[in-house]
Swiss-Prot record:
Zn(2+) 1 binds at residues 221, 226, 239, 243. Zn(2+) 5 binds at residues 341, 344, 357, 361. One of its GO terms (molecular function) is zinc ion binding. It comes from Homo sapiens. It holds the Pfam family zf-C2H2. Widely expressed. InterPro entries: Znf_C2H2_sf, Znf_C2H2_type. Zn(2+) 4 binds at residues 311, 316, 329, 333. Induction: During fibroblast senescence. SUPFAM superfamilies: beta-beta-alpha zinc fingers (SSF57667). This is Zinc finger protein 410. It is found in: Nucleus; Chromosome.
Length: 478
């Protein structure tokens, strides 16, 4: 388990590596010895002493330059074990061979660690030569995952021939790994809470910038009058096809001919022809199937009652289960009425409102108009037809006594009484019959008398002689 101090200040490790010079091998030779002062951050006991570290002038005299060093000036490593309850326990410390430690100077190098200290890290305050007390701090942390079976500087793996700076390098490397993991864990925790953590470039402190900002939509439609913006180039490319009406994917089904902008829409459309509905609602008692996953997702909101699409217009507050419904609703607030009635010219904001208007008014009006035409349609010789043609009624044959001539037989007194009668020509009780088949288009009446038949045009009939001369009255012998 990493300590709270490590999680809050993991940047100390990075600063130490950047600002501290550590030899990489025994071939490194420095002409002068440098004082490395120990700045104590831990409680100092009476038995604690510090000694000066002398970097040797020549790497070949390591075996001959060893001097006796007090036992309190040795470098110790901390062995940490994780107990069964998840808490860290301090194990025994292992003493390192003081091969390169010198007692010729009184400057302190390292500080003894208290065996009773229960923290899980070691603070070794090392400074570069000339920096003094302004040196950066180093936090040495041993990775928990490597504690078991691979303790750093354990008594079994300790070798007096290994230089101390290699061990410090290894310890610093492990500490950097642990600190990086701690920082990543902290970033993941803050990201889950909706916060974005940035590391400052100047002071190295982490700062919370608040909620995550929305993704910037950089792709804007260049078509005049269109202000749509997009994040993904694929969506932007699809939108441009709508302006060009580029429907390059055509349905191959016979008699369909529908076209689409993208291939995926065509594939979904083909399911309407083959009847495929691969997406099923698994709610109890439902079992409805859909052609697309989006339709199934919208359908499930019926069961859950979820309406995630909220109208942001002031004072509205309506919410919808589908985004398409929200877009249709927004037209109401914009005042646009793009849907027009083809009969009366009235405009509507929604196509559904226009369709309701058509069914309510114009369909009833059309039915009423046809019914009125049927009711006002008079018989073939009706007076309204004659008045419309501006023909005097006294010169024509009138049949007002019969509502219809469709297939009915009319009894006439005699054949000579058809013409020249002012009011009514057709009278009941005649032994002779007239079979009339009305022709609404030509307004003709066929009359029979014995073996002879006559066709009379009622619009031009004046007298029998004129009818014969003009061809309005014809005689057929059968």
């Amino acid at each position: 388990m990493l300590s709270d101090e490590l999680e809050s200040k993991p940047e100390l490790l990075v600063q130490f590596v950047q600002n501290t010079s550590i030899p990489l091998g025994q071939g490194l030779v420095e002409s002068e010895a440098k004082d490395i002062t120990c700045l104590s951050l831990l409680p100092v006991t009476e038995a604690s002493e510090c000694s000066r570290l002398m970097l040797p002038d020549d790497t070949t005299n390591h075996s001959n330059s060893s001097k006796e060093v007090p036992s309190s000036a040795v470098l110790r490593s901390l062995r940490v074990n994780v107990g069964p309850d998840g808490e860290e326990t301090r194990a025994q410390t292992v003493q390192k061979s003081p091969e390169f430690l010198s007692t010729s100077e009184s400057s302190s190098l390292l500080q003894d660690l208290q065996p009773s200290d229960s923290t899980s890290f070691i603070l070794l305050n090392l400074t570069r030569a000339g920096l003094g007390s302004s040196a950066e701090h180093l936090v040495f942390v041993q990775d928990e995952a490597e504690d078991s079976g691979n303790d750093f500087l354990s008594s079994e793996s300790t070798d007096s021939s290994i230089p101390w700076f290699l061990r410090v390098q290894e310890l610093a490397h492990d500490s950097l790994i642990a600190a990086t993991r701690a920082q990543l864990a902290k970033n993941a925790k803050t990201s889950s809470n909706g916060e974005n953590v940035h590391l400052g470039s100047g002071d190295g402190q982490s700062k919370d910038s608040g909620p995550l900002p929305q993704v910037e939509k950089k792709l804007k439609c260049t078509v005049e009058g269109c202000d749509r913006t997009f994040v993904w180039p694929a969506h932007f490319k699809y939108h441009l096809k709508t302006h060009r009406n580029d429907r390059s994917f055509i349905c191959p089904a016979e008699g369909c001919g529908k076209s689409f902008y993208v291939l995926q829409r065509l594939k979904v459309h083909m399911r309407t022809h083959n009847g495929e509905k691969p997406f099923m609602c698994h709610e109890s008692g439902c079992g409805k199937q859909f052609t697309t996953a989006g339709n199934l997702k919208n359908h499930r909101r019926i069961h859950t009652g979820e309406k995630p699409f909220l109208c942001e217009a002031q004072g509205c507050g309506r919410s919808f289960a589908e985004y398409s419904s929200l877009r249709k609703h927004l037209v109401v607030h914009s005042g646009e009425k793009p849907h027009q009635c083809q009969v009366c010219g009235k405009t509507f904001s929604q196509s559904g409102s226009r369709n309701v208007h058509m069914r309510k008014h114009h369909l009833q009006l059309g039915a009423a108009g046809s019914q009125e035409q049927e009711q006002t349609a008079e018989p073939l010789m009706g007076s309204s037809l004659l008045e419309e043609a501006s023909v005097p009624s006294k010169n024509l044959v009138s049949m007002n006594s019969q509502p219809s001539l469709g297939g009915e037989s009319l009894n006439l007194p005699n054949t000579n009484s058809i013409l020249g009668v002012d009011d009514e020509v057709l009278a009941e009780g005649s032994p002779r019959s007239l079979s009339s088949v009305p022709d609404v288009t030509h307004h003709l009446v066929t009359m029979q008398s014995g073996r002879q038949s006559y066709e009379v045009s009622v619009l031009t009939a004046v007298n029998p002689q004129e009818l014969l001369n003009q061809g309005d009255l014809t005689e057929r012998r059968t």
